[in-house]
Amino acid sequence: HGWITLEATLAGFFLGTALGILLALGIVHNKAMDLSVMPWVIASQTVPILAIAPMIIVVMNSVGITGLLPKAIISMYLSFFPVVVGMVKGLRSPDQMQIDQMRTWSASSNQLLWKLRFPSSVPYLFASLKVGIAASLVGAIVGELPSGAIAGLGARMLAGTYYGQTIMIWSALFTAAF
């Protein structure tokens, strides 16, 4: 059951990381995107995932998409936010003096990104990835609950709840924790 949840966790984590990095690059390089997209990114995290997950599962099932993808999308939804916030903070972390120095050397915006901004953002990225993988695991487990899955840690927790098997619930929780 752990492998089923791990697949959805990793798929959602990689999708969320890619989306988060791309959004962060756009937000840092485009003022209009900063003013328009960043508030929506922050607002997206105000709605509890337990309210959104059943809707995502139902909508995707209605168009014939079942299995790994709905769980991965729920995991992605939870894991992209820390990556966006961390990367925006990291890409904006170089001092103005460093940016001015690069411009003095006639650095292009791509050189500024690859030689200054991106290396400065790596510590922020890894801190964000640490938070993002945990959020992705939570998303995968939550995605298994309303889907009627028969395999996975969320399905084991749900089955334990149905049949009053507290050992099954706790074993799934401990497996998810480690």
Protein language model annotation of sequence segments:
Residues 11-41:
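Transmembrane-helix boundary motif in ABC transporter permease subunits
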Residues 87-125:
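Short cytoplasmic-facing helical segments at TM-TM junctions of multi-pass membrane proteins
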Residues 42-82, 89-90:
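Generic hydrophobic transmembrane alpha-helix motif, especially the helices
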Residues 27-32, 56, 60-65, 146-151, ...:
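Short helix-capping/hinge motifs at transmembrane helix termini and TM-loop junctions
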